[in-house]
């Protein structure tokens, strides 16, 4: 009888310990979640938390052009884009008509919105090709089929990258740049001149587009005074 009571008591103690541990673990999880939601403030600065509007701003305004299933040109604006290596670019994309198109054709072109095309470029980001399949023609833009990939070149954008889809997984598009072409009007000594291209960037904090400014220093040169 005593052995039975001791056994029951031991089981109850174990259950109580487990309950206590679970309660403590839940408290720790809740505390960790609370800490993630409310990061410690940096002294002497305005702290914004993890507000997405300020992450990596300014952002590029890249225009992605594809053919749809009826061979109509489609263009959208994307801002979460960058260079992966010397021949590849990466763009973060959610589900769009553009993603359907590039998965079908395996190709796309990338151009850069500029001061001359602010309204048209913004329109391409506002309106889906699913709703307005002729949106490229609607703004008066024209296209030329790329000779290198199965995608259109938008003639009104003077700098274009012709890309082949390497992969598109979990919203991350990786493209191989097979050719870059530029209109003579934006070149100086045979090189792309940003003062002539006049690309714009997206200011996510102010929700506006901004022009790039003047050169403020020579790359791999301005810092040599500290060597």
Question: Where do the language-model regions lie?
Answer:
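Repetitive helical segments and hydrophobic/amphipathic motifs
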Residues: 11-12
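Short, low-complexity, disordered segments immediately C-terminal to signal peptides
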Residues: 19-34
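Basic, polyanion-binding surface patches
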Residues: 30-227
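Positively charged n-region of N-terminal signal peptides that target proteins for export
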Residues: 1-4
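C-terminal motif of bacterial Sec signal peptides marking the signal peptidase cleavage site
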Residues: 15-17
């Amino acid at each position: 009888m005593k052995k039975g009571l001791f056994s029951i008591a031991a089981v109850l103690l174990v259950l109580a310990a487990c309950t206590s541990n679970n309660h403590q673990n839940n408290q720790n999880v809740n505390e960790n979640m609370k800490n993630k939601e409310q990061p410690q403030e940096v002294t002497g600065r305005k702290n914004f938390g993890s507000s997405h509007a300020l992450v990596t701003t300014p952002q590029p305004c890249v225009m992605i052009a594809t053919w749809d299933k009826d061979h109509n040109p489609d263009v959208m604006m994307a801002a979460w884009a960058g260079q992966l290596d010397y021949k590849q670019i990466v763009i973060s994309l959610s589900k769009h008509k553009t993603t359907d198109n590039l998965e079908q054709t395996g190709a796309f072109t990338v151009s850069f919105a500029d001061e001359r095309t602010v309204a048209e470029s913004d329109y391409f980001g506002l309106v889906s090709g699913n709703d307005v399949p002729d949106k490229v023609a609607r703004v008066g833009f024209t296209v030329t089929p790329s000779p290198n990939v199965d995608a259109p070149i938008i003639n009104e954008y003077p700098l274009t990258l012709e890309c082949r889809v390497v992969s598109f997984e979990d919203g991350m598009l990786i493209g191989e740049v097979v050719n870059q072409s530029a209109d003579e009007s934006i070149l100086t000594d045979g090189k792309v001149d940003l003062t002539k291209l006049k690309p714009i960037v997206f200011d996510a904090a102010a929700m506006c587009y901004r022009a790039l400014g003047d050169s403020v220093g020579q790359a791999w040169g301005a810092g040599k005074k500290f060597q």
